Amino acid sequence: MGKIIFVSGIDTDIGKTIATGFYAKRLMQQGFSVITQKMIQTGCQHISADIIKHRQLQGIELTAEDLNGITCPYLFRYPCSPHLAAEMENNPILPSKIAQASALLAQKYDYVLLEGAGGLAVPYNSQQTTLDYIVEQQLPLILVTSAKLGSINHTLLSLIVCQQHKIEMEAVIYNTYPLEDEKIAKSTQLYLQQYIKQHFPNTEFLVMDRQ
């Protein structure tokens, strides 16, 4: 059975999709078989746009699991929060369906990288959030952060919440693209590296530039 790792971010549009493909490619270069999965995709039809991007970054074609929907169990047309998109299409999101899809993939691949939608507190129904899913499934986490002003606050809040919920931190990926202010980016990187080294000594810190 392969290892399932959740990928989330400190905010929406933080670079999770690129980071997921980046990390998948990195594992592939180490000799592992890797598949990515999208928990929920909104603003899309037919095949998840994020899955397509993952495959481009991995340098592979779409898989059979992509074409039959296993790598993205929930696909909604309207570009909004998952809970609203599901409500609009009268298609409630069931965590069991996502978990079953991940388990199927884990039977075939060494690693399954499961990318979430938005940040940790994004709701996928009226009662449950992404964080709830990670905790319930006991999944290790890759957290994607950025060099933008304000990201230290968002990153630390996310890490503190994960610590409180005893979530295993697999890695933190520091996305430097787009580089808006080099001085802020370097200072933020140094601060986060030191913080993670002190509070999460077993967590890998990776820097990702434009892919």
UniProtKB/Swiss-Prot annotation:
CDD domains associated with the record: DTBS (cd03109)
Paired cysteines (S-S): none
SUPFAM superfamilies the UniProt entry points to: P-loop containing nucleoside triphosphate hydrolases
Binding residues for substrate: 42
Protein purpose: Catalyzes a mechanistically unusual reaction, the ATP-dependent insertion of CO2 between the N7 and N8 nitrogen atoms of 7,8-diaminopelargonic acid (DAPA, also called 7,8-diammoniononanoate) to form a ureido ring.
Subunit-level organization: Homodimer.
Entry EC no(s): 6.3.3.3
Keywords: ATP-binding, Biotin biosynthesis, Cytoplasm, Ligase, Magnesium, Metal-binding, Nucleotide-binding
Ligand binding (ATP): 13-18, 50, 115-118, 175-176
Cellular-component GO terms for this entry: cytosol
Record-annotated membrane-spanning stretches: none
Protein name: ATP-dependent dethiobiotin synthetase BioD 2
Residues engaged in binding Mg(2+): 17, 50, 115
Residues in coiled coil: none
Cofactor(s) in the UniProt record: Mg(2+)
Enzymatic class: ligase
Similarity field: Belongs to the dethiobiotin synthetase family.
Entry annotation: catalytic residues: 38
GO process terms (BP): biotin biosynthetic process
GO molecular function: ATP binding; dethiobiotin synthase activity; magnesium ion binding
Domain of life: Bacteria
InterPro entries, per database record: DTB_synth_BioD (IPR004472), P-loop_NTPase (IPR027417)
Encoding gene, per UniProt annotation: bioD2
Species per Swiss-Prot/TrEMBL record: Haemophilus ducreyi (strain 35000HP / ATCC 700724)
Biological or metabolic pathway of the protein: Cofactor biosynthesis; biotin biosynthesis; biotin from 7,8-diaminononanoate: step 1/2
Chief site of localization: cytoplasm
Reactions performed catalytically: (7R,8S)-7,8-diammoniononanoate + CO2 + ATP = (4R,5S)-dethiobiotin + ADP + phosphate + 3 H(+)
Compartments where found: Cytoplasm
